[in-house]
Amino acid sequence: ECRDIANNQKRYFQLSNSVADLPAQTSPLPLSVCRVPDQRSSVSPSDPYAIAYPITWDGVVKKEKLKVLFIPFDFSDHPATGNPTSTYSQDITKFKEWVKWYSNGKKIIEVETSDRWIRASQPSIAYEESLGHGKPNSKVAVEMLLKDSETIFDYSTADVVFLIFPKDLKTFQTETTRIDYIQTNKGRLRLGTYATGLQIYFKPHELWFWLTHELLHHVWGLQQHAPAYPVYLGISTGTPGPGQSIISWDQMTLGWVNPEDIWCSDTKNLSNAEVTLVPLEREQEGVRAAMINLTPSRTLVVESHRKDKWGNFNAGTYGVTAYIVDTRYATDRTGEYAGKDDGKGILYTKVAN
């Protein structure tokens, strides 16, 4: 394959479909040296998500197995036909595989669904004021819909409900996200509640990608959205695109990495070293990031990226990213899509906090 290299040159590389796990590489220092703690002066109660290990937010779902209900609804004013799982069966598969791989088996997803559309008791227009991005009363619509499916699903064993509507339904333009106490026939339960909207189908998003990004926020307590550029590099930006891996810093914040996944040093002990990195998008054992601790709050992170299972990039896409994490600063998403950056790492959009 012909690839770009340094000095505007091109070179052919021999590719192989057979990839072996990398041999162990000894890290000069333990993982804890590079895993600097959160040093923000304050954390807003309205934005409690973690930027560093350990995650201390009391809303985190800590158990190993997460039970998720994929509940397909249609409406009298918009009936659906066929088996609804034909729309999202591959999303369920990818959802399970992604979480298993990137959590190193520390988390397991269990999904229950229905192979027929469940008719909502009201036409879709009756829920329009409640469902959609940022609408404060989505809980009302969710409780109404869950009542319509209570004979099919046992909510008492669920952690998350994902309401899936027909792809061509235009009543709900945007998606719904909420974690709250929901009144059900099994009592008042704390559930993550999510619902599709027209935009989610036409961005285009893969349903599993959007849902997983939101669960990383609301269920597992991760801030994400840093670094914000390139926007299509991974799941942390929430932007649908070819990159579907999770950056190693976020993986480490979640407690999902194993010690052998990270090569760590600091400025005092740094010397010439050759470290072979596994691409974040590839399911391959080996060092996933090289980190250098700079100060008590700052760590340099270097990662490799390639076209692979979790990176649907164009042929020949490969490279290395480097970013600095500084845990003194909260993630500032203002200007995230405007490309603004003060170049100092304080007004954040292109640099990591």
Language-model segments: residues:
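Extracellular low-complexity, Gly/Ser/Thr-rich intrinsically disordered linkers
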Residues: 282-353
